[in-house]
Amino acid sequence: MGNIFEKLFKSLLGKKKMRILILSLDTAGKTTILYKLKLGETVPAVPTVGFCVETVEYKNNTFAVWDVGSHFKIRPLWQHFFQNTKGARSPGSTHQGSLASGVLPIKCSHVEFGMWKGGRSHPFLPHSSRCAGSGGQLDSILPHQSPAWGPWGCKDLSSGFPSFLTSSILWKSAVVK
């Protein structure tokens, strides 16, 4: 009987735990965004070799954020990072065409974009950095009506502006069940 009340109490007041991937091409700002979320400040970063994992707590949510390296030898392994993932974030510069020409085909070739193990759809939040107003360019790339995608959103951001990062975290926690 005590277990029932404990589960009920945790479900009502407990923290929501989510695993989030940050995937993109080289030097797109993945590590900068991760540490801006974790520490609240920009730190000098070097290219990620392999992956980096940090736990970020925001309001009533706990995010295990995975910054996955994007060297061409690592990209085929991206599919393995999607297990038990509640969503993905993809920073990139659409000015350089990285989202359209690099990241989207890579992800689509390894998993149904927006689909993870078990056929469940999850939120995907592409971020567009270094080019103001470029989020509109993603509207022509990403299918709005595909039931396989689940909810998705796009935010133009710079890792130097924490309000954009926190609004994306709030969006993620709102759409993830």
UniProtKB/Swiss-Prot annotation:
GTP-binding protein that functions as an allosteric activator of the cholera toxin catalytic subunit, an ADP-ribosyltransferase. Involved in protein trafficking; may modulate vesicle budding and uncoating within the Golgi apparatus. GO terms for molecular function: GTP binding; GTPase activity. The keyword Protein transport applies. InterPro entries: ARL17_C, P-loop_NTPase, Small_GTPase_ARF, Small_GTPase_ARF/SAR. Its main location: Golgi. GO terms for biological process: intracellular protein transport; vesicle-mediated transport. It comes from the Eukaryota. One of its GO terms (cellular component) is plasma membrane. SUPFAM superfamilies: P-loop containing nucleoside triphosphate hydrolases (SSF52540). Belongs to the small GTPase superfamily. Arf family. It is found in: Golgi apparatus. GTP binds at residues 24-31, 67-71, 125-128. Keywords: ER-Golgi transport, Golgi apparatus, GTP-binding, Lipoprotein, Myristate, Nucleotide-binding, Protein transport, Transport. This is ADP-ribosylation factor-like protein 17. It comes from Homo sapiens (Human). A lipid is attached at G2 (N-myristoyl glycine). The keyword Nucleus does not apply.
